[in-house]
Amino acid sequence: MEIKTNRLCIRRVNRSDVLHIRELNKNDNVNDFFGSVPEADRAEAFRDSNAVEKLFTLMESNLDTDNDIFYGAWKNDTLMGFIAIVNPTSHTPGIQIEIAPAYHHKGYGYEFLSAILKHLFETESFTYIQYLVMPTNAASIALVEKVGGALQKPGSFIEKLLIRVYHITK
């Protein structure tokens, strides 16, 4: 499966992609970068100093399973982001997106997410996807709302403080 957009080539991430990305990030630059970002601005997943390596390990371990599906978006042979479909066979599959900082605020996230949603709804027979976002992540909230995500009423006060749940339907 390969999806071409105006600026991107999108496909499932394979083992050699993960190994290549891991090799590119083998030095401590990426972990150093996350260490230099103020803790309040770092996503929970990246508060650990080895978060990037753990992410690659998770991606690699799930490549041959139905647990999660990873899609990458390449621009001119450079991986600019990935999308993970979490629990794709469940009744409440989730979606997560990461875009490299150099591509922020240029429409790449929308282009990538829109293409993947179209693929999931039209080709993979998905009818519903859940998108979780921190209330302070304005860019992610704007992105999910732009693709038609509907904010769900929080189930608890704690949920209201910590997370926003959006539903994206076909």
Predicted regions and their residues:
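GNAT-family acyltransferases
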Residues: 1-101, 160-170
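Structural motif
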Residues: 28-29, 124, 148
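Small side chains
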Residues: 72-73, 109, 149
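Conserved acetyl-CoA-binding loop-helix of GNAT-fold acetyltransferases
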Residues: 105-119, 138-146
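Conserved GNAT acetyl-CoA-binding A-motif
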Residues: 122-132
